[in-house]
Amino acid sequence: MEELLIENSQRFTIFPIQHPECWNWYKKLESMTWTAQEVDMCKDIDDWEAMPKPQREFYKQILAFFVVADEIVIENLLTNFMREIKVKEVLYFYTMQAAQECVHSEAYSIQVKTLIPDEKEQQRIFSGIEKHPIIKKMAQWVRQWMDPARNSLGERLVGFAAVEGILFQNHFVAIQFLKEQNIMPGLVSYNEFISRDEGMHCSFACFLISNYVYNIPEEKIIHKILKEAVELVDEFINYAFDKARGRVPGFSKEMLFQYIRYFTDNLCFMMQCKSIYNVGNPFPQMTKFFLNEVEKTNFFELRPTQYQNCVKDDAFAFKLFLDDDDF
């Protein structure tokens, strides 16, 4: 039986620490805590309106994916990993990750509410699984590999790394290119926060596979999972570019195809497997961002000096007028 799944009936508290490396992962993740209201999107509204319609359509597909994907990640954490895993240090990490995923989900909802005032169009994005066949297909694939009745813990961790890494990565890339155009500063800031978090989540899954999983899946199974994820990303990219009529400034879909293969080979390395694609990075000017090497000081520099919120719906507004008696 996997060590991660063995109950220690004699352990009731986190101290003394028994798995220091896992504890260090948790503490690093804890240090990255932020809230969805910390990003100012007021300047994004004009940039969004000035953006060519095909480009807006492309980014709407990305938002539709993210709104759904984070909820599925939360579902897996709460219904599977957090119920099964017994090593407290790992459980602490996943508890913190679940909280972060809730922040991400809220952040994407704020982005949709801020940029897309039409309620019917908002609902089409919030209902991504029903309205976008490729998003439904991706969601089904994620649930398939997260199913404990069908897959070993090792296989599910590989699938989880593929979700947090491969399925998300090209979308992070596409949003980050808006920074090069000097537009959408709020969306870009959210992207930098979230991509940093997801990089940690993905890396931790790879760490567990390499250091804690006894029944590591065969290399051919790992490759199968990763290649399936790449194929889904390819399909999504084609779909999003079709919606944009093939016109998205800064990159082509062929560059995104190559990048996701480059990223997947990096995942193979982290899982101590042979590379699959052996391709170079088509975006060398953004390597530091893509590999989540942003320094912690830069992360905190992203925080605005005051909280602002441009969403007009009171249900999404952040209440800043609490006095001390409310705590």
From Swiss-Prot:
Give the matching CDD domains: RNRR2 (cd01049)
Q: What class of enzyme is it?
A: oxidoreductase
The Enzyme Commission number assigned here is: 1.17.4.1
- UniProt cross-references to InterPro entries, sorted A to Z: Ferritin-like_SF (IPR009078), RNR-like (IPR012348), RNR_small (IPR033909), RNR_small_AS (IPR030475), RNR_small_fam (IPR000358)
One GO MF term attached to the UniProt entry? metal ion binding
Q: Which PROSITE patterns match?
A: RIBORED_SMALL
Which cofactor(s) does the record list?
Fe cation
From which domain of life does this come? Answer: Viruses
Q: Which Pfam families match?
A: Ribonuc_red_sm
Q: Note the coiled coil stretches, chain numbering.
A: none
The UniProt annotation places Fe cation 1 binding at D70, E101, H104
**Residue numbers binding Fe cation 2:** E101, E164, E198, H201
- Catalytic residues, chain numbering: Y108
What causes induction of this gene?
A: Expressed in the early phase of the viral replicative cycle.
Give the record's GO biological process terms. deoxyribonucleotide biosynthetic process
UniProt key word Iron: yes
Q: Which reaction does it catalyse?
A: a 2'-deoxyribonucleoside 5'-diphosphate + [thioredoxin]-disulfide + H2O = a ribonucleoside 5'-diphosphate + [thioredoxin]-dithiol
Question: How is its cofactor bound, per UniProt?
Answer: Binds 2 iron ions per subunit.
Q: Which UniProt keywords apply?
A: Deoxyribonucleotide synthesis, Early protein, Iron, Metal-binding, Oxidoreductase
Q: How does it assemble?
A: Heterotetramer composed of a homodimer of the large subunit (R1) and a homodimer of the small subunit (R2). Larger multisubunit protein complex are also active, composed of (R1)n(R2)n.
What family is reported? Belongs to the ribonucleoside diphosphate reductase small chain family.
**What is the annotated role of this protein in its UniProt record?**
Ribonucleoside-diphosphate reductase holoenzyme provides the precursors necessary for viral DNA synthesis. Allows virus growth in non-dividing cells. Catalyzes the biosynthesis of deoxyribonucleotides from the corresponding ribonucleotides.
Q: What is this protein called?
A: Ribonucleoside-diphosphate reductase small chain
